Amino acid sequence: MRAVCQRAQSASVTVDGKVVGSFEGEGLVILLGVSVTDTEAEAVQVARKVAGLRMLDGERSLTDAGAPALVVSQFTLYGDVRKGRRPSWTRAAKGDQAEPLYERFTAELEAAGVRVERGVFGAMMDVSLTNSGPFTLIVDSDELAGPRRG
């Protein structure tokens, strides 16, 4: 599972011209990709890590600050561009596998006290945000389990 976390001062997601999720004030926009090997354990692990990351002003986390998160599903985070010019999506989980894990991730954030705004799973979405910093981190469940690099 991959979560691209961007600190933002405001954000919104629109589907078919209607705003379906938004926040004003400091929070995180989280683009979430689910791989074919992910399980509920990865969803819980990544959500807990994201909830506690000190990415907000004053070295605070989402839970410390009571700040919101806008979570948007994004299968393209698992695009493989090693061969040719067209990305391969074979590592990205299909919707029937990915959606329950997306829901588990958001539920775990909520259990940590985070106000979660959502996109619409699988929909074509327009995401707007005002980056703060910019400050962006990528949390990858494969890297959380392995030895520290560098």
From Swiss-Prot:
The keyword Hydrolase is assigned to this record: yes
Keywords: Cytoplasm, Hydrolase, RNA-binding, tRNA-binding
One Pfam family linked to the record: Tyr_Deacylase
Record has RNA-binding as a keyword: yes
Localization of this protein: Cytoplasm
EC identifiers of the protein: 3.1.1.96
Catalytic activity: glycyl-tRNA(Ala) + H2O = tRNA(Ala) + glycine + H(+); a D-aminoacyl-tRNA + H2O = a tRNA + a D-alpha-amino acid + H(+)
A biological process from GO: D-amino acid catabolic process
Family: Belongs to the DTD family.
Domain notes: A Gly-cisPro motif from one monomer fits into the active site of the other monomer to allow specific chiral rejection of L-amino acids.
Quaternary structure (record): Homodimer.
Record-given protein name: D-aminoacyl-tRNA deacylase
